[in-house]
Amino acid sequence: FTNRAISYRQDKNYDHFNVALSVAVQKMARSDRGSSGVIFTLDTESGFKDLVLINSSWGLGEFVVKGMVTPDEFKVFKPTLKKGFKSIISKRMGSKEKKLVYAHGGVEPTTEQGVDPVDRHRFTLDDGQILKLAKWAVIIEEHYQRPMDIEWAYDGFMQELFVVQARPETVQARKTGKVLEEFVMEQTGKIIAKGAAVGAKIGQGKARYIKDASQLSDFQKGEVLVTEITDPDWEPIMKIASAIVTNAGGRTSHAAIVSRELGIPAVVGTGNATEAISGGMEVTVSCAEGEVGKVYEGLLKFRVDRTDLTNFQPPKTDIKMIAADPELAFNYSFLPHRGVGLARVEFVISNFIKIHPNALIDYEKLTDMGVKQQIDELTAGYKDKVQYYLDKFAYGVGQLAAAFYPYDVLLRFSDFKSNEYAGLIGGKLYEPIEENPMMGWRGASRYYDPSFEKAFSLEVAAVKKVREEMGLWNLSVMVPFCRTPEEGKKVVEIINRHGLTNRITPEARKNKKNGEPIEGLEIWVMAEIPSNILQVDEFAEIFDGFSIGSNDLTQLTLGLDRDSKLIAHIGNERNKAVQKLIGILIPAAHAKGLKVGICGQGPSDFPDFGEFLVGLGIDSISLNPDTVLKASINIKAVEDKLGR
């Protein structure tokens, strides 16, 4: 007759005195000498069903389930795992400050221990163990024919993995996917706490700090629950909270699981919420901005966009997305799409890697101790600093490719300008000061330069890992800002030299269908410089497709500085000169058997420009996710008007 049991029976209309108990007895896996955790056979935040999500920490599993530690997190992609690939698409190290172990003597059977710093900075599972657990999870899911929530343990004495519990996942599995619901912040303010976002909603209200069960009766409906961790007995008050914020825990902790079931936003593992948020303070809790949940001071404005997809009819022109943030990719995968026409890797480099590649390559030679210390902090657990860059790059790109699989994902190799590269840790040691970086050392000219070729080779190696190790053959690559055919040849030769040799054949390219990945690699080029179009026949001999970069093409055709507001009024992609170039490119590329796409908001913002492109027979249009639905409807109307 605990609060939780009484509440459950009330919800289910069970008689309090007409229930029975059962007791299961099973061998205890000695994970106190190993590790343990939980597995979900889908992405718990988005409901993406092609993922196995594994959480793991040292010691007995109770700390992971209760959210008392921030565990390691691993993501495995099911479709290519089933084909025999090592499809680990993400590895994130948790802080793992403490663990639960058996107690020797005393009243309590278990006790809490601190984790050795060396163990905190290494993963709790190796790749073989991650893949074994993922395969078991897929077998269990296929047996029960539904997404599953699984607990597992690694016995440190026997050196064996065990599955100790499996039950149906009860939140995302119930969603129909017919109505898209998106919460959007309309204001920003002072951020007072950050942690892992649970769900994608926004909640707000007065904060109430609950230290222990004795204070539960103080909690009022609509308040924001702020606490160290939650306990199963707290579920009656969690139901009436507008949001939940905890100091400890990960995405599979008790607070996270119950929040998802209740449809309440939660930010877990903040570390400092109970100190940063005062009782009675009005706060807004946002889980709608990616994997990082934010607690803002004050009641900020937000909105909820709902779209019914029941009768949605896609256009014949491929509508693709512009994607950058791997943490949002699985949410965006539910939008109607035909893949990604521009995957921007700059976001991965600046937000996940944060270090200039040459600073990692030259780590042993660095004399700037400040830079070296920053690198040490970010690369904790990596003896090989170059491997850190390669792994982070591959995991970021791998998640983008997996989210939109089996449709094509076109990755643009890094297109930072020198001033942007200088902003990375160690970047000022390697980057020149240019008067106009927009027109300077960027794109293809970097890749074959002796001072950057090693750095570029890491990008190539990461793409090779994504395609050949993870099995994500839907990933293709694109070379930006390639001024001449000679530059194009140099870059393709470097790509081949560093391991990406399995190029698609012209015959395979001709027969290739979007949504049916094949092993051959496509290498596209951005058509963003007039020379790309004026020499289209020569570029077509080197590359497998063209992607129009309308911003740079407009800038370079009209001689505009696109960062200058003073001359922005002069023209955009609808200018006759720009359209004339596009009108040359599309039929010329088609005559050579190559496809042409465009990246940018023009077709969405200007219906007449969209009609112009469809009339020319453009193969794909890539847009920001928030305009995909609107643009799809507009392009379908244009196709109907033109009788396509």
Residue spans of the language-model regions?
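Beta-strand scaffold of nucleotide-dependent catalytic cores
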Residues: S35-T44, F48-H104, L161-R167, K175-K178, ...
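Structured core elements
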Residues: S22-Q26, V38-T41, V52-N55, D149, ...
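Conserved phosphate/anionic-ligand binding catalytic regions in large, soluble enzymes, centered on
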Residues: M28-F74, M148-A173, S253-V258, L328-I349, ...
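Conserved catalytic alpha/beta cores of large enzymes that bind or transform nucleotide phosphates
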Residues: V52-D149, Y154-F157, A196-K201, K221, ...
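Conserved alpha/beta-domain cores
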Residues: D32, A137, T307-R644
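Short coil/turn segments at secondary-structure boundaries
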Residues: R4-N13, R146-A153, L410-S414, S476, ...
